[in-house]
Amino acid sequence: MLSASTVNPSAPWQANLWLRYDRPGHRTRMVECLVQAPLKVQRSFYPDDTGQCQTMLLHTGGGMVGGDRLGYDIVLEAQSDVCFTSASAGKIYRSLGPWSEQTVNLEVRVGASVLWCPQETIIFDQARYQQNFCIKLQEQARFKGWEIVRLGRTARGEKFTQGHWRSSWEIWQGDKLIWGERQQLIGSEQLYESPNALAGFTCLGTYVDLSRSFDQDLVHQAQEIIHSQGRSPQFGLTLTATQGLIARYRGNSTQEVKDIFTQLSQVISP
């Protein structure tokens, strides 16, 4: 592992993490890793006998401030299987001007599989944050994962009434864009209270499963998972044009949405 960590401690972070995996036998392995502070990875581990490699992503700086630019460039060679998690919730601190930005580029080659399941991101009031995902899938490659955002430090009674959050997703199959989305929220009291925006809720989640084609039976299974928890109107399910599944959450509990998304990833996916 190489680490380039010579930085000015008073300057914004400009850091990248580059990883590559292959699968020469039963187990997926990390074969290349280049890191820059404050980004790190824990040693890979294998919690079961499937050969899936689990990698925990770390941010040792404690959070992002205005002007920080963090990038993840990850390649999975053919038949690799990797689950990415994070050690703790991400934190985006308030900024008087510059944006914080994080970009994730995933290249998933033939027959490889990715599960992307980090902890939530907490966006402080008055923060400015841009999150970008670009996922490129080759033939028979699979992706499932989520993004969970908490707006404001609600444990302190803070609301997201000032600030700006943007999220961009692009998922490609070869040279075809199979799913893309742009989200944007500009903090205000009106946004917080509007039934067409946050409706007083503080947590948003998006789950994307492009690991298989979903028929109505699988959609029904997904609905049963949601309804069995006693949650109803703040979840939504959508089939994409390529028969992938998108689930959405609007509520107040990061633990609730993580539990539901975890069940979806375990029960209805191969």
Curated annotation (Swiss-Prot):
Keywords: Chaperone, Cytoplasm, Nickel insertion. InterPro entries: UreD. One of its GO terms (molecular function) is nickel cation binding. GO terms for cellular component: cytoplasm. It is found in: Cytoplasm. Belongs to the UreD family. UreD, UreF and UreG form a complex that acts as a GTP-hydrolysis-dependent molecular chaperone, activating the urease apoprotein by helping to assemble the nickel containing metallocenter of UreC. The UreE protein probably delivers the nickel. PANTHER family: UREASE ACCESSORY PROTEIN D. This is Urease accessory protein UreD. It comes from Synechocystis sp. (strain ATCC 27184 / PCC 6803 / Kazusa).
